[in-house]
Each structure stands twice: as structure tokens, then as C-alpha cells.
């Protein structure tokens, strides 16, 4: 009798799970899900991008998957992306609440940063504040250029010391990108062996791999394992470590800042807290500031450094493209001390190369997950409120018919017949719409100034004993090239870049 009772409840449990995994009426098609696991077995845990493409070919540009018991819609192609992220932006601007990347924050989920915050008045207020603060601290202006050029000086010192050797540029580019955003956020740069830089960069690298790895997928698919001491708990510890480091910086700023005379992003936020006083409730608060800063630091470090790694991998293995870039740089800059971001308008080929690097790097291939804020429609399908939305940016950046050479590295993708720089509408490495990456303009300025300055002074060479280059990326929240080494030589013309 007891055994029959248990079996009955097991059957009821699985029946309920099967009902939860049924697609709503007029929902996008997709592969049949399994109870508990959903479509987890339809995706490679190491790199699901190939599976997303395989499913797109079978089910079309709008199809559905189940992440455990939760329905998700994968959107592909320029037409679908524009309808969702631009035409119906408000309907698709939410953030899912019950997933690993949201839960691994060590503080209340209502006090997260800006990237994972749901679409709300608080999110709008913080995004507006960040954009205004970045503008005030020189984003797009000469003062920001000087910060970037100053950091490049340290990168060039590293390269000069490495002449005649074979070395990995990974840490060098990560540290440079991290220091540039640190100057905006904290008003200071760090030596490359500083504990803050070393720990934060390492924590973010580990969390990037965990968040898009098998354990995060299992966390989302099988809720009953969430309290077990499994490998995903490492991400929780990493965020707690970073939170303590930023808390210490906030304490230092409180002791040294002059109210009303902000020197960096932290000062601006603390001034805003003073201005609002106790009337603001939880919209602006120190806990939110901690996660806000970590969001901005991660977004400003990982994507830029991985794009640089991808860029120099291609430039080394396409030496004719590297040489043509250098010829254009020499012609435009002549005897000037350093490049300016405004020089991009006179460097169409360099612009094309940088954008092609971004297209091939595709550093955030699934963007950050969205969810619908209302019952809505997409390409004729009905999507209930709260539906998880996954953008397959790879489908746009390599879409047939949108690019001259969709599957190969070729700057001609961004040049017209007259050799002028053009940007196709399918170029969406930062997604599109109101939740597009906050640091897009900073990233573009960094990429241009760093690549132009380094190419002006150095020749980058693929080592003879390195074998054939492998362009296959390592999958995580951000894509990164497989580790590689480079050699550098000084070019014939020598130029200095004053800080």
C-alpha cells in the first residue's frame, strides 16, 4: 500500500512536470522537452552555439527551448532582432529573475547592478545616471583619450620588454582594459601586479566560465540542486570577494572625497546619495552601488580585452591586412605624437578592420538574457509575459545576405566600392535597443586608440613554431580566443606616445 502511494505521487509529480513543459498556444516551435531537464540534452554543455544554429535551420529564426521547466525563445536574424529589440523594445526589455546569473549575487536580488536589473523606473534612472556621469568624465572627449593613451604607454613598455621573445598577450590586454575603466570608476590606475586587479580579473574570468558552463545550466534546469555544495558555489564566493574589495574602495572615497567636487564615478554616486538623502528609499543605495560598479568593471574589461586578443590574432595571421593598416596609419598621422579618436574619420580601412574584428570576435554571442514585460507577439507568434528571450547575435553577425563574406575575416565587409567605411545594419555586437551595452562608445574609443597606437610602433608576428592558428573560441559569458603567443618587432619608424 505504501509503495503504491509513493508510486502514485511520483506519477503525479512527473505528470505536473510534463504539463509545465508544454508550449503555450501559438508559441514558437522547438524540440520536444524532457521533464525536469527540458531541452538541456539538445545543447552541448561546452559550446551550445553550434546547436543553436542547428535548431535555427530546423525550426526557423524564432524557435523555443525549455531551460528546465522554463520556456525560452531564441531569436535569430536581423529582421527578428529589429522587431524585438527596437520596434517592440519595451515589450522585450525585461530581465529574467530566476536564473543562475541573477542568483549568484550575494545580496538581495532587488539590489543588483544595472546589467541584470529588470526593466523599471529604477533601472531607467540608473542608466540615465551612468550615461550622464560617463559624459561628464570625458567619454568621447579629449580627457578620455588622454586616459587611454596614458594606459597604452604601459602596454608599450610591456611589448618593448618582450621584443625577441615569444609571449602571451592575454594578461597584458586584460590589465590594460581593466585599468582604463578603473580610472573612470575609481579615479586611479593600478600596477599590473596589484592585488585588486589580479583578484578582480581572476574572479570575473572564473565566473564567466561558470555562468555559461554545465553547472550553471544544471542550476537553472534542476532547482532542487541549488543549495548543494556543487562547483557553481565558487561563483558566489567570487562575487563576495569582489564585493569586499569594492566596499573598501567606497570607504576610502568617503574619507577622502570633497562633496560636490567628484573625481570619479564613485564620487558622483556618493554625491547623488547625499542629494537624495533618506527620501529615496532603495533606488540609490550603497549595496546597489557595489553591484553597479562590478557590472561596469566587468563589461568594460572582458569584452574589450577579448576583442583585442581576437584582433591581434587575426592581424598576425593576415600580415597583408596588418601592413595595409600600418600604411594608412602612417599616412594619416605623419609626424604627430599620437592618434586622436577623431582620426577614425580619415582611416576607413582601419575602421573596417576594427569592426570586422568585433564581428568575428562576437564576444557576447547570446547577449544578456531578456524577458518579455507584457504579453506580446513576435513574427506572428504569441509570447506570454515573463518569457525568457535569448538573442543569438552570431546569427546576425554571420547572416547570409547581410555580409559580402559572412564566414571569413575580411574588412571588405565594411567597405563600399569606393573604399569608404560603411556599417551594415546587421552589425550588432552590443545588441540593440534601450538595453544596448552602456560602454559601447568607450569600447570603440579604446579599440581604435590601442590598435592604431600599437600598430604604428610594432609589427606583430605569428611565431614560426606555433603551428596553424586556431580561431575556435573558448565559450563563456564572453567568447575569448584560445590561448596563443605572439612575437613583436619594432617598426622602422619610431614614435612616442606622451602621457
Segment roles from a protein language model:
Residues 24-43, 50-144, 168, 173-183, ...:
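Cytochrome P450 substrate-recognition site 1
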Residues 391-419:
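Conserved cytochrome P450 K-helix/beta-meander segment immediately N-terminal to the heme-binding cysteine loop
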Residues 1-23:
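Terminal signal-anchor or tail-anchor transmembrane helices
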Residues 27-30, 74-84, 91-93, 187-192, ...:
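Classical protein tyrosine phosphatase
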Residues 319-321, 440-478:
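Cytochrome P450 heme-binding "Cys pocket" and the immediately downstream C-terminal segment
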Residues 40-60, 244, 338-380, 387, ...:
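Conserved cytochrome P450 K-helix E-x-x-R motif and the immediately C-terminal K′/meander segment
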Amino acid at each position: 500500500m505504501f509503495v503504491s502511494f509513493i508510486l502514485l505521487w511520483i506519477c503525479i509529480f512527473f505528470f505536473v512536470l510534463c504539463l509545465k513543459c508544454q508550449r503555450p498556444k501559438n508559441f514558437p516551435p522547438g524540440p520536444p522537452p524532457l521533464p525536469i531537464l527540458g531541452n538541456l540534452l539538445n545543447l552541448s554543455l561546452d559550446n551550445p552555439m553550434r546547436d543553436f544554429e542547428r535548431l535555427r535551420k530546423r525550426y526557423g529564426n524564432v524557435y523555443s527551448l525549455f531551460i528546465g521547466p522554463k520556456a525560452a525563445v531564441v531569436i535569430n536574424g536581423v529582421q527578428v532582432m529589429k522587431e524585438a529589440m527596437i520596434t517592440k523594445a519595451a515589450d522585450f526589455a525585461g530581465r529574467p529573475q530566476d536564473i543562475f546569473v541573477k542568483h549568484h549575487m550575494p545580496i538581495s536580488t532587488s539590489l543588483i547592478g544595472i546589467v541584470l536589473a529588470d526593466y523599471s523606473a529604477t533601472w531607467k534612472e540608473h542608466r540615465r545616471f551612468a550615461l550622464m556621469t560617463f559624459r561628464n568624465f570625458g567619454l568621447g572627449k579629449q580627457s578620455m583619450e588622454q586616459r587611454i593613451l596614458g594606459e597604452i604607454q604601459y602596454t608599450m613598455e610591456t611589448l618593448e620588454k618582450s621584443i625577441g621573445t615569444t609571449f602571451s598577450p592575454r594578461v597584458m590586454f586584460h590589465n590594460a582594459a581593466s585599468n582604463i575603466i578603473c580610472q573612470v570608476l575609481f579615479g586611479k590606475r593600478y600596477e599590473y601586479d596589484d592585488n585588486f586587479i589580479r583578484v578582480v580579473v581572476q574572479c570575473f574570468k572564473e565566473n564567466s566560465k561558470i555562468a555559461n558552463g554545465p553547472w550553471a545550466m544544471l542550476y537553472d534546469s534542476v532547482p532542487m540542486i541549488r543549495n548543494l555544495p556543487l562547483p557553481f558555489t565558487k561563483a558566489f564566493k567570487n562575487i563576495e570577494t569582489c564585493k569586499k574589495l569594492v566596499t573598501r574602495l567606497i570607504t576610502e572615497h568617503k574619507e577622502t572625497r570633497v562633496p560636490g567636487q567628484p573625481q570619479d564615478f564613485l564620487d558622483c554616486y556618493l554625491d547623488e546619495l547625499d542629494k537624495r538623502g533618506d527620501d529615496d528609499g532603495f533606488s540609490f543605495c550603497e549595496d546597489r552601488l557595489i553591484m553597479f560598479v562590478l557590472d561596469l568593471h566587468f563589461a568594460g574589461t572582458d569584452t574589450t580585452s577579448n576583442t583585442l586578443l581576437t584582433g591581434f590574432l587575426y592581424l598576425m595571421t593576415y600580415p597583408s591586412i596588418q601592413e595595409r593598416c600600418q600604411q594608412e596609419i602612417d599616412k594619416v598621422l605623419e609626424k604627430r605624437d599620437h592618434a586622436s579618436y577623431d582620426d577614425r574619420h580619415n582611416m576607413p580601412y582601419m575602421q573596417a578592420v576594427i569592426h570586422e574584428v568585433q564581428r568575428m570576435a562576437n564576444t557576447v554571442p547570446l547577449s544578456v538574457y531578456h524577458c518579455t514585460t507584457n504579453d506580446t507577439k513576435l513574427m506572428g507568434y504569441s509570447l506570454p509575459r515573463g518569457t525568457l528571450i535569448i538573442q543569438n547575435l552570431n546569427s546576425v553577425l554571420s547572416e547570409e545576405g547581410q555580409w559580402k563574406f559572412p564566414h571569413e575575416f575580411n574588412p571588405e565587409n565594411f567597405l563600399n566600392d569606393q573604399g569608404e567605411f560603411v556599417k551594415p545594419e546587421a552589425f550588432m555586437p552590443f545588441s540593440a535597443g534601450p538595453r544596448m551595452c552602456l560602454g559601447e562608445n568607450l569600447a570603440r574609443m579604446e579599440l581604435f586608440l590601442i590598435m592604431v597606437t600599437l600598430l604604428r610602433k610594432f609589427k606583430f608576428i605569428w611565431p614560426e613554431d606555433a603551428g596553424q592558428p586556431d580561431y575556435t573560441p573558448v565559450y563563456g559569458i564572453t567568447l575569448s580566443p584560445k590561448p596563443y603567443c605572439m612575437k613583436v618587432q619594432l617598426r622602422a619608424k619610431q614614435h612616442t606616445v606622451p602621457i
